[in-house]
Amino acid sequence: MAYADKCYVGKRVKLNLLDEGEVRQIHEATLDVIESVGVKFHSQKALDVLEANGATVDRESTVAKIPAAVVEKAMSTVPHEYVLGARNPEYDLPLDGEHIYISSDGCGVFARDPKTGEVRSSVKQDLADCAKVVQALDNVSATSAVVSAQDCPIETRVLHEFDACTRNSEKHNIVVSIKEDWEARSLLKMAEAMAGGRAELKKRPMFTAIICTVSPLHQERFGMDLALTLAEAGIPVSFYPMPILGATGPVTIAGSAVVNNAEFLSGAVLVQLAHPGAPVMHGGGPTAMYMNSGAYASNSPEALLLRSCQGHMADFYGVPAWYGAGATTAKEPGIQSAYENALAMFMAYANGADVTFGTGLLDGSRILCLENMLVDDEIIGMVKRILTGIEVSEETLAVDLIKKMGFNGNYLFDNHTRAHVRELWQARLGETGNYDGWKNAGARSTTEKAQEKVAEILAVPAAEFPADLGAEFDAIIAAAAREAAAV
């Protein structure tokens, strides 16, 4: 069985928070904004592409105003389905609307020791450890630069992060922090080495790039230049706006949804105009803040509703939806992180997310906590089962069985039960026994059990990494370091 089969939910249960008319209103408001106000593109390459295709460009202000007709033409070429490749093809992820995935999060700067609880600056080994945990979890489908490898040279840090993730996990990889041309070119060389060449990389892209926009209505130079480079190579790009209600976007959910959508749409249009058919995703991590303190409110009700709009807009444009879920503001694993992440993940997938980003961080995406990933893995398993819904058929109605059993029957040992019992979700981490049994077994908390499981995972060597590929990675990173030093 391919790994993706574990992530299949079919025509999932959806909440449908927005109706078709409301989705169209957000779309039309977005078109109004990007044509009348425009978007600031701090990239001359991007402005060249937009101007050549009918946008009105002011070079001094770097504002591009994009007519609705240009938007519609560009979005007509987006691919609706494609595959995210993995080092081991068994872990390839089809994006077809019938599977749901989560990756580890990014990009924190601290790591929490699972034994002592001590919080310190993150290093490359933390990414390796996180990748090993991702590999071991059934419900976490992709690894990422979850924290910064601060013990590596800044010029090649993103390459070291990709190296750590790839050597320790066979799953798809998420890249977030590319800022320079040599990083992009070097990363593509590493990905081509994994895939077996540029042509194979286009068929099975080895990584997805998350490109953060700057709210309100800015597209940074390095992000847009990177998007154009990666799109040409067939690498999926998820544009990732993060407007904050009442700060960098309107305080109303619908208003900030327009800002979020404008930043996604302007980036997607650019990519499609330059490279029609390049894979893009409707991404983002829009959020709120607590107005009485200014504190980040990543999983407030308003933030969850705002992010839910993205799934509806992605469906409207016919592109995969990739957005943030799981960035709890809790400072330690426990009750707060569990209820925040459970609600965030359910709301994301029930409103159309194909992939969420992600799990593994506390304190508003700053502190890596490996044991919290195991709790999230359990939550995602529950959410998947709920979204699969209820099958109603002659077999599942079981009328003949009910008649046979009557008033005194015991269904436990019937063939029908044996045939379907494995369909029932089973807890792996949560406590399901009786109180006395739990107490007599040491009264371990869920966090303690997760810590023990993390230790077990890290004690097992990662899957063998091909020596020739490792040598090629080392050579590419060394060459990038020399190129960076010469700039």
Positions of the model-derived regions?
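N-terminal small/glycine-rich loop or linker at the start of catalytic domains
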Residues: 22-24, 31, 94-116, 316-328
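Glycine-rich, N-terminal phosphate-binding loop and its surrounding beta-alpha-beta segment
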Residues: 45-118
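Flexible, glycine/charged-enriched surface loops at secondary-structure junctions
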Residues: 40-47, 60-61, 141, 201-203, ...
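Catalytic-core signal marking the mid-to-C-terminal active-site face
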Residues: 2-3, 17-28, 37, 42-48, ...
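Short beta-alpha connecting loops at secondary-structure transitions
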Residues: 11-15, 292-298, 326-333, 360-372
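Helix-rich catalytic cores of soluble enzyme domains
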Residues: 121-350, 354
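Non-catalytic terminal accessory/regulatory regions of metabolic enzymes
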Residues: 1, 8-10, 31-32, 37-44, ...
